[in-house]
């Protein structure tokens, strides 16, 4: 009987250790790296960071402007596991964050990737958090002409993918917590134009996840 109890306790311990707090799809991007860094340092999270190919993740760049212009060191931490999001992901995690995208005139596969992740969503998942874009859904009508040009021209496929992602996430609203963010402009720090720094935006996302979890 004691041996059986020990085995059960051991298996429960393994399950707790192997369940990530965060699964970040797009962990190698500017916002993704902020989420990884702040998740580990500020929230003591274990993080599954998923990138286009299995490689290391750099520390986030924190400077002024919209462009990253300083090479950053690789992030190595015992609470971070990096994998390719095209691999079969069967890990347990509590919160899924989707923050992939494409550049001007590029093909955006974010909707395909979102479908892949949702089809293998673990029972342990408590929330889905999508980083969409201003100009998707009902926000297009109230957006300025610049956003409307991006939507219809050089970021056309990105907006198509974001709209599809939002539709997918909305189907899970009755099953778990879902959040869709539509930032207008993301920067790395201070800018002359109106923008939100990736540092502040990542902090907002993580606060929403873990503040509500504790209620």
Where are these regions (language model features)?
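N-terminal Rossmann NAD(P)H-binding glycine-rich loop of SDR-like oxidoreductase domains
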Residues: 20-44
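Conserved Rossmann-fold NAD(P)-dependent oxidoreductase catalytic core, especially the SDR/UDP-sugar
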Residues: 48-53, 115-158, 171, 179
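Conserved Rossmann-fold cofactor-binding substructure of NAD(P)-dependent oxidoreductases
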Residues: 71-93
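NAD(P)-cofactor binding segment of oxidoreductase domains
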Residues: 94-130, 164
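Short-chain dehydrogenase/reductase
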Residues: 107-111, 144, 151-164, 195-199
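Conserved beta-loop-beta element that borders a ligand/cofactor-binding pocket
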Residues: 166-189
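Alpha-helical substrate-binding/gating segment
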Residues: 197-215
